[in-house]
Swiss-Prot record:
Similarity field: Belongs to the gamma-glutamyl phosphate reductase family.
Keywords: Amino-acid biosynthesis, Cytoplasm, NADP, Oxidoreductase, Proline biosynthesis
EC numbers for this chain: 1.2.1.41
Pathway entry: Amino-acid biosynthesis; L-proline biosynthesis; L-glutamate 5-semialdehyde from L-glutamate: step 2/2
InterPro entries, alphabetized: Ald_DH/histidinol_DH, Ald_DH_C, Ald_DH_N, Aldehyde_DH_dom, G-glutamylP_reductase_CS, Glu-5-SA_DH, GPR_dom
Reaction equation(s) it catalyzes: L-glutamate 5-semialdehyde + phosphate + NADP(+) = L-glutamyl 5-phosphate + NADPH + H(+)
Name of the featured protein: Gamma-glutamyl phosphate reductase 2
Gene3D superfamilies: Aldehyde Dehydrogenase, Chain A, domain 1 (3.40.605.10), Aldehyde Dehydrogenase, Chain A, domain 2 (3.40.309.10)
Organismal lineage: Bacteria, Bacillati, Bacillota, Bacilli, Bacillales
CC annotations in GO: cytoplasm
GO MF entry, a single one: glutamate-5-semialdehyde dehydrogenase activity
Organism: Bacillus licheniformis (strain ATCC 14580 / DSM 13 / JCM 2505 / CCUG 7422 / NBRC 12200 / NCIMB 9375 / NCTC 10341 / NRRL NRS-1264 / Gibson 46)
């Protein structure tokens, strides 16, 4: 280990220790204190908007010079509306029920010993993410409301934005009963800083990565700290033979074009061959109208003008753009097999008017979120009524799907007796 990496390691460990110490007081914070802290964060973000946007402009300029694509720049960019959305999101989280201290179950043993299962914070959350300044705010708000301290490690491309946001949040916390040490930010842009977080098992209770597949895979494969995996979204929509044409096209266009750069956007369209034969003109018009570039299998290329032949990488790709892979299938089984092979267990949808076909799809496909006649864009904490989310888990333990406040808690068992001993 070099002197530089030793210094980085020491700095990160110091921050993790501070977060762990702050987590002790957060466990005892009242709902009122946590809500007041969130309100203070919201106020300070609005009051310091000019400063935040000025710093964000530095990141955008640097990103463009480095040749980042439009989708990347979009995720990186802030404006007045987005900062106001951050503030509103914090206030919405404040309005949600406190997930801590809830009695999940209780019972009395035959010997009179009373048992209770109660929700408690996870402790210290390590958040590793890329060019997403919104995560800095969203993750902090959810962590504090659920009684957790947080260590933030954003991508180097958003360093000015994140530094400004955390500075403002620290100022806000200084006016509340929540310690500023509950929010730690790793300023180092050295890649070794991220790797140091992987090994902080003594101080950090869980790591949550948010970003591209390479980042998530690196964390999952190398961390000794437990990981809540937020997988990439290679989302599919299957248009069944008995799909309503207007409904199918509307849902498909929404899922692909509403926000192409997010993880719940459509990436692969699977179309039943009979439906495509009968509705190709309407589908082609919709694709052309919205500037969607198709990468298709042999049948799709034959039937959709301008379609490019799809390779193996296209079926695996999270485009995050207006590119769309299209497969023509002869049956529900073929569609489900394709999803089983290439899906990332994020969000999958079927469009059909046949309830039995829909039931078969919903029972067969393995994913965190499944839809019948609805867009995959609803896989979102806010859209599903959870409030904000810290990420969308594609694993099965300890949480799956959009992770809101309850997913940032665990439990402890409390037993109350009167001199009970085990015989």
């Amino acid at each position: 280990m070099t002197a530089t990496s030793e210094s980085i390691s020491a700095q990160i460990e110091e921050k993790a220790i501070k977060a762990k110490t702050a987590a002790k007081s957060l466990r005892l914070a009242t709902e009122k204190e946590k809500n007041e802290a969130l309100a203070a964060l919201a106020d300070h973000l609005k009051q310091n908007m000019s400063y935040i946007l000025t710093e964000n402009a530095k990141d955008i300029e640097a990103g463009r010079k480095k040749g980042y694509d439009a989708a990347y720049i979009d995720r990186l960019s802030l404006n007045e509306d987005r900062v106001l959305d951050f503030a509103d999101g914090l206030l919405e989280v404040a309005e949600l029920d406190d997930p801590v201290g809830e009695t999940l179950s209780s019972w009395t043993l035959d010997n009179g010993l009373k048992a209770e299962k109660v929700s408690v914070p996870l402790g210290v959350i390590g958040m590793i993410y890329e060019a997403r300044p919104n995560v800095t705010v969203d993750a902090t708000g959810l962590a504090l409301k659920s009684g957790n301290a947080i260590v933030l490690k954003g991508g180097s491309s958003a360093i000015h934005s994140n530094t400004a946001i955390v500075s403002v949040m620290h100022q806000a916390l200084d006016s509340t009963n929540i310690p500023r040490d509950a929010v730690q930010f790793i300023e180092s842009t050295d890649r070794s800083a991220t790797k140091q977080l992987f090994k902080m098992k003594e101080h950090i209770d869980v790591l949550i990565p948010r970003g591209g597949g390479a980042l998530i895979q690196e964390v999952v494969e190398n961390a000794t700290v437990p990981v809540l995996e937020t997988g990439v979204g290679n989302c599919h929509i299957y248009i069944d033979r008995e799909a309503d044409p207007e409904k199918a096209i509307d849902v498909m266009i929404n899922a692909k074009t509403d926000r192409p750069a997010v993880c719940n956007a459509l990436e692969t369209l699977i179309v039943h061959e009979k439906w495509l034969e009968e509705n190709s003109a309407a589908l082609i018009n919709a694709l052309n109208e919205h500037g969607i570039q198709v990468h298709g299998d042999e049948k799709a290329v034959q039937m959709i003008p301008g379609a490019r032949p799809a390779g193996e990488a296209d079926w695996q790709n999270e485009y995050l753009s207006l590119d769309l892979a299209v497969k023509v299938a002869g049956s529900l089984e073929e569609a489900c097999d394709h999803i089983e092979t290439y899906g990332t267990k994020h969000s999958e949808a079927i469009i059909t008017e046949n309830p039995e076909t829909a039931k078969a799809f919903l029972n067969t496909v393995d994913a965190a979120a499944l839809y019948h006649n609805a867009s995959t864009r609803f896989t979102d904490g806010g859209a599903l009524g959870f409030g904000a989310e810290i990420g969308i888990s594609t694993q099965k333990l300890h949480a799956r799907g959009p992770m809101g406040l309850k997913e940032l808690t665990t439990c402890k068992y409390i037993m109350r007796g009167d001199g009970h001993i085990r015989r």
